[in-house]
């Protein structure tokens, strides 16, 4: 069973190395859902020099957030994150200039962007500026 689990857990990453190699040569925005693979995925992104990354609905360890931030990666948050203790702790550690919003519709039944902004005390203009900065990075 142990060998099976190791194969099962590592197989998706072996496939993704081809995608990462391709992305390393492109200047694209990459949105990643890193659930239960945050550290491994982060290390792979850094190893392949992938830039312009958005960590979608990040739920990983708080200790990894400073490293993600150091690489200038963004985080997309939604209203549901603002309603849980773990989500609030994550949001507190993200610099405001690296926050984007998302609804995660239709999976997240609570999906109000305006409520998300109100809950974290961030205005639409700040999100617009963050997104504009990300877009301008791929236009260079």
Model-assigned labels for residue ranges:
Residues 68, 91, 104, 131:
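Conserved, mostly hydrophobic/aromatic
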Residues 31-32, 54-55, 76-78, 100-103:
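Active-site neighborhood of phospho(di)ester-bond hydrolases with catalytic His/Asp-centered motifs
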Residues 5-10, 113-120:
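Short glycine-enriched, charge-decorated loop/helix-capping segments at active-site entrances
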Residues 86-96:
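Short amphipathic alpha-helices and their capping/turn segments at secondary-structure boundaries
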Residues 72-86:
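His/Asp/Glu-enriched short active-site or ligand-binding loop at hydrolase and phosphoryl-transfer sites
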Residues 116-140:
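Mid-to-C-terminal alpha-helical segments outside catalytic/metal-binding sites
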Residues 97-111:
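Short acidic/histidine-rich active-site segments
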Residues 1-71, 108:
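Divalent metal-binding pocket/active-site signature
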């Amino acid at each position: 069973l142990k060998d099976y689990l190791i194969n099962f857990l590592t197989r998706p990453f072996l496939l993704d190395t081809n995608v990462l190699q391709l992305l390393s040569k492109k200047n694209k925005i990459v949105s990643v859902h890193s659930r239960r693979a945050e550290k491994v995925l982060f290390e792979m992104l850094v190893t392949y020099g992938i830039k312009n990354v958005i960590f979608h609905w990040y739920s990983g360890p708080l200790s990894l957030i400073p490293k993600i931030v150091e690489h200038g990666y963004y985080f997309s948050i939604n209203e549901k994150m603002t309603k849980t203790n773990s989500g609030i702790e994550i949001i507190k550690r993200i610099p405001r200039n690296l926050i984007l919003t998302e609804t995660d519709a239709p999976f997240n039944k609570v999906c109000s962007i305006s409520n998300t902004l109100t809950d974290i005390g961030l205005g639409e203009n700040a999100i617009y500026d963050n997104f504009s900065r990300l877009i301008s990075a791929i236009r260079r």
